[in-house]
């Protein structure tokens, strides 16, 4: 696994909007100002500005046009760091953009170049946490980011990143935040613990991993529910190269130490049978990414 190592100066969040781009940056060096430039992909300069803010919005851009965002940190008039350049494309988007990665932006390779597997969690304090992994087919698929909002989702900021972490689900239980995730596509099933999403424990392994050829655990950010004194969530096993996935559940007592793998149980995995009553007709190879739900009768 090639680890993600943040640069001394980095654009850590992008939020394109209607004729605009918003971004957050972080610097691990001493600085007194930032110089921001926006170029078209043919090199034409569109905007330039100096700022002492780590959150910037630039407007007056053309929707549907690809741009290159460049950022340098300065101190006493000298450039002390240059951030990796970021691609973006403004446009009208529904809701609020938590984070954005242009499909041709390779900054997070080899994990991938597309945000995926979103998870959203409200803490007892009212703070919202949101996470996504970084995906692309046949890539490492092992990096996730966690963001926070303290104003009901109006604004967001980066809290942390987790690696290895893929297909992750945020959930809260008895005073702690957890991330249930894979180490990679069909990798090991892992569990992380945090107080508030900013810093995380080392992961513990709940199920051993496989690979795309042999098959392995598979999950998505599906609900974690409490029922009959246990926490439950859905888990699959298989791979597309093996023709599909079988389905199961994992669970743990609600009063157990969730970071103790010996406390967890797996039901085993039920292969799909197209002869089941009510099964879909056609070429389906099975079910995937199901929900654990509590029926009305308990």
Residue ranges and their predicted role:
Residues 13-17:
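Short, solvent-exposed loop/linker segments at the N-terminal edge
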Residues 1-11, 24-70, 74-220, 225-298:
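Beta-rich carbohydrate-recognition and catalytic domains
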Residues 19-23:
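Structural beta-strand segments of beta-rich domains
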């Amino acid at each position: 696994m090639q680890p993600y190592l943040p640069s001394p100066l980095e654009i850590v969040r992008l939020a394109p909007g209607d004729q605009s781009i918003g971004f957050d940056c972080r610097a691990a060096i001493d600085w007194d100002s930032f110089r921001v430039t926006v170029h078209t992909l043919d090199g034409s300069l569109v905007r330039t500005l100096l700022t002492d803010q780590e959150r910037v919005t630039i407007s007056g851009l053309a929707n549907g046009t690809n741009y290159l965002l460049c950022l340098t940190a300065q101190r006493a008039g000298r450039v002390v760091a240059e951030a990796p350049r970021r691609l973006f494309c403004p446009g009208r988007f529904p809701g609020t953009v938590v984070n954005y990665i242009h499909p041709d932006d390779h900054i997070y390779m080899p994990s991938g170049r597309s945000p995926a597997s979103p998870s959203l969690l409200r803490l007892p304090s009212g703070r919202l946490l949101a996470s996504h992994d970084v995906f692309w087919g046949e890539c490492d698929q092992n990096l996730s980011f966690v963001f926070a909002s303290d104003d009901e989702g109006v604004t967001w900021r980066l809290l942390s990143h987790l690696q290895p972490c893929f297909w992750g689900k945020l959930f809260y239980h008895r005073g702690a935040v957890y991330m249930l995730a894979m180490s990679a596509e069909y990798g090991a099933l892992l569990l992380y613990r945090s107080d508030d999403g900013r810093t995380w424990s080392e992961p513990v392994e709940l199920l051993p991993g496989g690979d795309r050829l042999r098959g392995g655990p598979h999950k998505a950010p599906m609900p974690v529910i409490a029922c009959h004194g246990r926490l439950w969530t859905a888990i699959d096993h298989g791979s597309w190269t093996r023709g599909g996935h079988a389905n199961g559940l994992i669970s743990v007592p609600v009063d157990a130490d969730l970071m103790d793998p010996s406390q967890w149980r797996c039901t085993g995995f039920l292969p799909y049978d197209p002869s089941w009553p009510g099964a879909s007709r056609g070429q389906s190879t099975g079910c995937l990414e199901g929900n654990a739900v509590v029926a009305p009768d308990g």
